[in-house]
Structure formats: C-alpha cells, structure tokens
Amino acid sequence: MAKTIGLSIPNLDVEPIVQNLRECIESGWVSTGGKFIGDFEEKIAKYVGVKEAVGVQSGTAGLHTALRVLGVEPGDEVLVPTLTFIAAVNPVTYHGATPVFIGCDDTLCIDPNLLEKFLREECTIKDEKTYNKKTNSRIAALAIVHVFGNMANMERIMELAREFNFKVLEDATEALGTYYTEGRYAGKYAGTIGDAGVYSFNANKIITTGGGGMVVSNNQEFLDEIRFLTTQAKTDQLYFIHDEIGYNYRMLNLQAALGTSQIDQLESFISTKIKNYNLYKEAIENIDGLTLLPFNTDIRPNYWFYSVVVDEEKYGMNKDELLKKLVEANIQTRPIWGLIHEQKPYQKHQAYGVEKAVWYHDRVLNIPCSSNLTEEDAKYVIEKLKEFKR
C-alpha cells in the first residue's frame, strides 16, 4: 500500500464548509467578530446540555483562563495527571502555581483511589482549605483529563472535591461527545460535571476548526468572566477601557464557520469510530501479545483514540519496535505522551503513585482512528499487526 494511513486526520465535508467560509469572507467578518462564533457556541452548548459556551483561541487558552477564574493563584498547587499532553499542565505554571502529579488507573485517567489516598495521607485541612503537608501550599484545584475519549470517575472525584474544598476543571479536550449512561451523572457530558470544562478543536480532534477551543460551565458569572478576560478585559466596548489584564484568546469567525458544519456531523463521526473500534477489537483479541484498551462500560465514549498495549514477551517486540515497523508500512502511529513529571521543566515537582502510568507509557501505541478511516484501511492495519508478530 503506497498511501499513508493517517493516525487521526480531519474529516472535512467540503461543500457545507466552503459555503460557510464563503459567507464568512463575503461578510468581511473574518477575525474575532461575526455571526458564526455565536452560532458555534450555541451549537456546542446545546449539544452538551449547558446554557452557554465561550469560544476561545485554543484548548490551552481555555484551560489557562479557566484556572484564573476558578481562583488559582501564585503559590497554589493544582493536582494534575502525569499521563497526559503537556498542554494540560503548562497553564498551571502560567499562573505561578505548581502542578502535583497523580498516577492513573486502567482507564488512563487519574486514579480516584490514589487521589483520595494523597488527599487523606499527604494533606491537611485548615480553615476549610486543603494544604499539602510537604509544601504547606493550598490545593486550589484538580485539572482532570478525560484521556483519549474515556471518562474519569467523576462521581468519586466530585465527592472528594466537595470534602476537600477544591475546584474541578475538566480537561475534556479529547472527550467531546463522551457522556455517562449510568449512575449519578447519567446523561451528563464530559466537561459539564465539574466547575468548568474545556474542549479543543485542534486538527487531530474528533471535530476541528483548525485550532480553537471552547469553555463551558453551568455558572453564568464564571462564563461572563471568561468572555471578559479572553477579549482583553475590555470594560467599555467603545472607549477601550481596561480595568484588568486580559488575553487575546478570542476564537476567529473563520474557525467558527468551519466548526458549525463539523458539530453537525459529530454523531456520525462517532458512529464510524465505534464501528472501526469493534473491527479492531475483534481482530486484536486473536493476536497474542496485543490488547486493545477498553473504554468504561458506564459511558458512551467518543472513541477518539484507540490504544494498543504491546506485551513484548508475547508479541516478540516492544512498542517502539512495532511503531517503527508500522511507520515503514505507511501506517501512522505514535507512542503515548512522555510522562509530564519526567519532562525537564517538571522533574523536581511532586509525583504521587505514578507506577501504573510508567507501565502504560512503556507499552501503549495509538493506531489509526480517523473518523473517515475506511474498513479497507483498518483491515490493512490489522493485517500488518498480525504479520509483524514474532
């Protein structure tokens, strides 16, 4: 096969996109104003079941601003996963706060048991605030990442947040479309359970605006402050009065014009991802040494990324060797992210219970999962996975 099978490429229906972009360009509103921004915000809000959403420049911009509005201050600590992309952690540092890394469970999300153990054994409560015994710093928030479209255990997490009095920011940048089907939060979408949620529309996400992100919350005052800060904290729209330091984090009308057509196709994209996941699952179950990681059974995931665990002893090669073979076969794949507590800027930061994260880091590959992946291409990937086994 001469062509390359991409890992997670945009699925772009050209006709409606071009129609929207033409309307956007002809209107002259191509920058940070125009009707498509409001239209896209309304569609996202309706889809995930909140009253309002605020479009921003990127998922990172959304996380940065949300942490500020949630009250994270210099000297505070924010609990974060180590198994994630670094963009989920850097915004903590932007505020002069310190990330504390917590390990994962088999969902690849933060382990609620480890989280509880850390809070009970490594922290103390004083004046209704939780402090890290080791550093005497306030635990201001938890930034929880719903990894690869799976869902962290939000029931446990919200119970702990209430008991230990910290804010919960849901990094749902990978999980737009994932929702609970059972339990206390049945029907609730990733990003809508904590104090705030953030989505990303980067090119490899399940829907894209090229870049861009969205902040959601059920707290109107919070969203008003997000909108205010991301538009340069302009107090007077006519006379350019600014009472605070804000950010140029606004979404472009051009981006939103693309997004309004993409969101209409989201459920169709997820249906394709479910079909391809099941195709992989049936085949990989019969390849000794490979395991396709499951998603939680109490959710409808968006199946954003498919994760294969490579058992070197049984498969005959490790995940790095398999990655190289797949790339040589024109199959784009990637290792899981480098653990953040091991990255140079964060090596001196506290990391708690990260052994399982290390285990998965050493064994996981992501295989092609685009929402326009054909059955033929998926079968080619499967064929090569079988062929490469030693």
Feature-to-residue mapping (PLM):
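PLP-dependent aminotransferase-like
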Residues: 68, 72-147, 151-163, 167-179
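Active-site PLP attachment segment
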Residues: 192-230
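Buried hydrophobic packing segments
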Residues: 62-67, 88, 213, 259
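Conserved PLP-binding active-site segment in aminotransferase class I/II-type PLP enzymes
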Residues: 1-69, 73, 144, 162, ...
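PLP-dependent aminotransferase class I/II
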Residues: 38-42, 50-51, 113, 125-137, ...
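Structural detector of well-ordered beta-strand residues that form the stable sheet scaffold
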Residues: 54, 79, 100, 168-169, ...
